[in-house]
Amino acid sequence: MFVDQVKISLKAGDGGNGITAYRREKYVPFGGPAGGDGGKGASVVFEVDEGSRTLLDFRYQRHFKASKGENGQSSNMHGKNAEDLVLKVPPGTIIKNVETDEVLADLVEDGQRAVVAKGGRGGRGNSRFATPRNPAPDFSEKGEPGEELDVSLELKLLADVGLVGFPSVGKSTLLSIVSKAKPKIGAYHFTTIKPNLGVVSAPDQRSFVMADLPGLIEGASDGVGLGHQFLRHVERTKVIVHMIDMSGSEGREPIEDYKVINQELAAYEQRLEDRPQIVVANKMDLPESQDNLILFKEEIGEDVPVIPVSTITRDNIDQLLYAIADKLEEYKDVDFTVEEEESVGINRVLYKHTPSQDKFTILRDDDGAYVVSGNAIERMFKMTDFNSDPAVRRFARQMRSMGIDDALRERGCKNGDIVRILGGEFEFVE
């Protein structure tokens, strides 16, 4: 099983601002307030797409920002709500909060959705604040900021196809030319030290997941060269693509390579001996390869199909992809997977953290200022237009109603002391 993991940043859309406006119509004296509310900001929603296989798209774009709601308008017209930003993910994607490591969602079924970053509420227009004592309020609210957080996406995949063979036979090169994967390729053994995964599409649009596994060596079934770790990955694939360097350029005989790898597979797990296998004769662009291929076919017999290719000139690559897709189609109803011990009995559930809205804390800065923090007070701070004196007075009333003024006095706050909330500074006045 391979884990594809990527970290991304999400920013839900801010709510649109409410506006301060008045009804100005001929023959209608004292028309009253007419400021509309802002629209709701877009949420960031993850949705399962059964056709998606990897998290590759998220490696090219790491930051996602949803749209802001429209501002309110005069004549009590509300701003338009923004459309949610929907991000498609493969089945089996787990979404975690990077900061807390909390599981926010475990998405498994096609079409399943989870709202991970909630869009901000639209600010209220001045019409909303009209009362008998204040029939024409001259302030409005700013839109609520959308949620902002970093999340990690984890996807556990079973590869359909596993590339096996000795080091430097061309497995990584093959994966790089038939998929968008970018495995490390070098002119030395064991360039690949961990499995690489790629989604491959045959010319007829049949697709499958291919894994480039680190090169096996003799003794791998006994753990030599981290053999157990690599063979465990092979155990979970449906089809084995056995690549052989037909040129013998590494000083090994192709037929011996074939026998050794198959012996190691069978020694590790007897069932691997019967796993569907496609033999690929690589490096056919080299002059020695043709003669070696004739001898190789004579040795293994006609029952084992061999597909000659060159990953350098890309000869016969399409034929190989057709053969792999056909073999997968033939064994599509056979389950070769091995259950993970830790996965038994797991219930997949959707988690959603809902922070308390009314608690606050008061701390002291080094310069003696009082620092007030908390979800509710910070939300009100962000939604207050501090360029409007009436809005500032309303904010002060809200602080008193929440008990913040009394709590500051209990902490020793006196007339003229500095109080900080987020980026704002206020002078405490009795």
Swiss-Prot record:
Region (Disordered): 118-145
Boundaries of every Obg domain copy: 1-158
Entry GO terms, CC: cytoplasm
InterPro entries recorded: G_OBG (IPR031167), GTP-bd (IPR006073), GTP-bd_Obg/CgtA (IPR014100), GTP-bd_prot_GTP1/OBG_C_sf (IPR036346), GTP1-OBG_CS (IPR006074), GTP1_OBG_dom (IPR006169), GTP1_OBG_dom_sf (IPR036726), OBG_GTPase (IPR045086)
Biological processes annotated in GO: ribosome biogenesis
UniProt-listed Pfam families: DUF1967, GTP1_OBG, MMR_HSR1
Top-level enzyme category: hydrolase
EC number(s) recorded for this UniProt protein: 3.6.5.-
PROSITE patterns from the UniProt entry: G_OBG, GTP1_OBG, OBG, OCT
Coiled-coil region(s): none
Keyword field: Cytoplasm, GTP-binding, Hydrolase, Magnesium, Metal-binding, Nucleotide-binding
CDD domains, per the entry: Obg
Highest taxon of source: Bacteria
Protein location: Cytoplasm
Binding positions for GTP per the UniProt entry: 165-172, 190-194, 212-215, 282-285, 310-312
Residue positions binding Mg(2+): S172, T192
Residues annotated as domain OCT: 352-430
Family: Belongs to the TRAFAC class OBG-HflX-like GTPase superfamily. OBG GTPase family.
Job description of the protein: An essential GTPase which binds GTP, GDP and possibly (p)ppGpp with moderate affinity, with high nucleotide exchange rates and a fairly low GTP hydrolysis rate. Plays a role in control of the cell cycle, stress response, ribosome biogenesis and in those bacteria that undergo differentiation, in morphogenesis control.
Protein name: GTPase Obg
Gene field: obg
